[in-house]
Amino acid sequence: MAEASAAGADAGSAVAAHRFFCHFCKGEVNPKLPEYICPRCDSGFIEEVTDDSSFLGGGGSRTDNSTATHFAELWDHLDHTMFLQDFRPFLSSNPLDQDNRANERGHQTHTDFWGPSRPPRLPMTRRYRSRGSTRPDRSPAIEGIIQQIFAGFFANSAIPGSPHPFSWSGMLHSNPGDYAWGQTGLDAIVTQLLGQLENTGPPPADKEKITSLPTVTVTQEQVNTGLECPVCKEDYTVEEKVRQLPCNHFFHSSCIVPWLELHDTCPVCRKSLNGEDSTRQTQSSEASASNRFSNDSQLHDRWTF
């Protein structure tokens, strides 16, 4: 018992010989032992004040511009977001931090130094625990924390079927890599779709079949019925020379030949020069392209941006 009292007295005298600054209270405090936490807000985000510290002597503006203060504000903001709940077990791996979570839940039932409007306290961050050292552990840089949080967003789970630790907490309905993020991702999807559907139409007609199409003369009876070219929509005149397809549709030669050089089909009835219906062939080609696109999506877990 006497040894414990002596140890406590030695620890108290060691703390009294040093000055500590709480980044949440933004003031000088005398930390609680042996956890080294702030007596006002129960936060472990405290730091020993040394001769080169600017926490107390530099005024409020220098404190607000310090990296540690910016990190505290960032952490305070992320603490109240929905997805940070999943990150806490991975950002706080120290057993002492896990033990203090139960104590913090108990402290949240009453108001503290900041009054009833103060939001819930933050999880314990890296603390000053070493009695022999003269400098506390420095908090990690803001960039490192952000990289640690967002590094796993687009990574696949190491175990198939198991949720990734850096998940979106159910906000997304599938892997984030399956989504189109930004204009670049959308352009990649459209480009792949166009590439799959590029050659799904009927193939070009044979040149021999195109040249063998008969050239006929428009009669007065056809003109009286209002016969026109289905491509350019111009009315035919009597004795005008036009090309006749096997489906008995008439076209200007300058209108139908360029089309047949690209597609072996009638622009009106979609029948080929052989008299076969090309609609079924087109549907079969589109279904095949859709299956290829689906297979490609399954092979690639996420888009490459």
From Swiss-Prot:
Disordered, as annotated region: 100-139, 274-305
Catalytic activity, EC: 2.3.2.27
Ranges annotated as biased composition (Polar residues): 280-297
GO MF, one example: zinc ion binding
Reactions this protein catalyses: S-ubiquitinyl-[E2 ubiquitin-conjugating enzyme]-L-cysteine + [acceptor protein]-L-lysine = [E2 ubiquitin-conjugating enzyme]-L-cysteine + N(6)-ubiquitinyl-[acceptor protein]-L-lysine
Subcellular localization, as worded in the UniProt entry: Cytoplasm; Cytoplasmic vesicle, Phagosome; Nucleus; Endoplasmic reticulum
Pfam families linked to this entry: zf-RING_2 (PF13639)
Residue list for modification Phosphoserine: S133
Observed effect of gene inactivation: Deletion mutant mice exhibit resistance to RNA virus infection such as ECMV and susceptibility to DNA virus infection such as herpes simplex virus HHV-1. They also display a significantly reduced infection/inflammation-dependent tissue damage after pathogenic bacteria S.aureus infection.
InterPro entries xref list: RING_finger_E3_ligase, Znf_RING, Znf_RING/FYVE/PHD
SUPFAM superfamilies per UniProt: RING/U-box (SSF57850)
GO biological process: negative regulation of epidermal growth factor receptor signaling pathway; negative regulation of toll-like receptor signaling pathway; protein autoubiquitination; protein K11-linked ubiquitination; protein K48-linked ubiquitination; protein K63-linked ubiquitination; ubiquitin-dependent protein catabolic process via the multivesicular body sorting pathway
Metabolic or biological pathway, per its Swiss-Prot or TrEMBL entry: Protein modification; protein ubiquitination
Chain intervals annotated as zinc finger (RING-type): 229-270
Post-translational modification N-acetylalanine, affected residues: A2
GO cellular component terms, semicolon-separated: cytosol; endoplasmic reticulum; Golgi apparatus; nucleus; phagocytic vesicle
Entry PTM: Phosphorylated by AKT1, allowing association with the 14-3-3 chaperones that facilitates associating with TLRs.
Keywords from the named record: Acetylation, Cytoplasm, Cytoplasmic vesicle, Endoplasmic reticulum, Golgi apparatus, Metal-binding, Nucleus, Phosphoprotein, Transferase, Ubl conjugation, Ubl conjugation pathway, Zinc, Zinc-finger
UniProt feature, compositional bias: Basic and acidic residues: 100-110
Primary role: E3 ubiquitin-protein ligase that catalyzes the 'Lys-48'- and/or 'Lys-63'-linked polyubiquitination of various substrates and thereby plays a role in a number of signaling pathways including autophagy, innate immunity, cell proliferation and cell death. Plays a role in the endosomal trafficking and degradation of membrane receptors including EGFR, FLT3, MET and CXCR4 through their polyubiquitination. Participates together with BST2 in antiviral immunity by facilitating the internalization of HIV-1 virions into intracellular vesicles leading to their lysosomal degradation.
Subunit structure: Interacts with RAB7A. Interacts with EGFR and FLT3. Interacts with BST2. Interacts with STX17. Interacts with YWHAE.
Name listed for the protein in its UniProt record: E3 ubiquitin-protein ligase RNF115
Biological source species: Mus musculus (Mouse)
Designated gene of the protein: Rnf115
